[in-house]
């Protein structure tokens, strides 16, 4: 971890090509959480050098060279030298906007929302894939018990709605805490 004021950087080894985990063959994944205003900074970050704006996410190789140069400059100024070096050596860094989605309802008639369609929390809790898999198992359980009925979908909602909301709240809390925002010694017992 590296925690510059109001930001967060983390990194960890992952398997390399062919799922290789031998020393020297692994890759290194890193994430730098940086706040950006939605009205100006984010729009600029999601606009390529040809002026094309990608509102839902810019393709990795389309990130403007100006933003990459600026990122590397800021990294040298505020990050630990090891992380600044990683950013210097990354040939094609990419960026992704992070949004929170907290649904108030996940069942609509004969439609049930699951996974990221129902809730999207900041990556700090690491629940995206796990939550989607759990939701698939829960809805399968209720369909097996009650058939493909509105009652099965309601049972699914009863079990998963509050949990999904709690996951998003916890991710928001951890994100604020890790970025040293809103964590001035207060204890948020609802989201611990």
Give the location of each predicted region:
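Short secondary-structure junctions and interdomain/linker hinges
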Residues: 78-82, 105, 163, 174, ...
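Short acidic alpha-helical/loop segments enriched in Asp/Glu that coordinate divalent cations
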Residues: 42-47, 82-93
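Short, conserved, surface-exposed binding loops centered on an aromatic residue
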Residues: 19-23, 75-77, 83-88, 103-107
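Conserved mid-domain beta->alpha element of the FAD-binding
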Residues: 30, 68-70, 88-173
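C-terminal domain-closing interface element
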Residues: 177-192
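Short, charge- and proline-biased low-complexity linear segments
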Residues: 46-49, 169-179
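Conserved FAD-binding catalytic core of PHBH/FMO-like flavoproteins
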Residues: 1-68, 72-74
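Alpha-helix-centered segments that form part of catalytic cores
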Residues: 60-84, 92, 179
């Amino acid at each position: 971890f590296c925690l510059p004021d109001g930001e967060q950087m983390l990194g960890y080894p992952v398997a390399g090509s062919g799922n290789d985990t031998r020393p020297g063959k692994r890759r290194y994944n890193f994430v730098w959480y940086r706040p950006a205003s939605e009205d100006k900074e984010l729009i600029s970050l999601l606009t390529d050098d040809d002026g094309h704006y990608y509102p839902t996410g810019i393709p990795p190789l389309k990130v403007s060279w100006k933003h990459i140069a600026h990122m590397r400059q800021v990294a040298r100024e505020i990050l630990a030298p090891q992380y600044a070096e990683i950013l210097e050596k990354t040939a094609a860094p990419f960026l992704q906007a992070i949004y929170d989605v907290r649904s108030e309802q996940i069942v609509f008639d004969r439609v049930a929302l699951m996974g990221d369609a129902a809730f999207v929390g900041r990556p700090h809790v690491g629940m995206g894939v796990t939550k989607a898999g759990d939701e698939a198992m829960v809805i399968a359980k209720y369909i097996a018990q009650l058939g493909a009925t509105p009652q099965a979908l309601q049972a699914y909602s009863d079990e998963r709605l509050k949990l999904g909301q709690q996951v998003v709240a916890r991710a928001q809390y951890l994100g604020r805490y890790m970025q040293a925002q809103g964590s001035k010694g207060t204890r948020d017992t609802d989201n611990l």
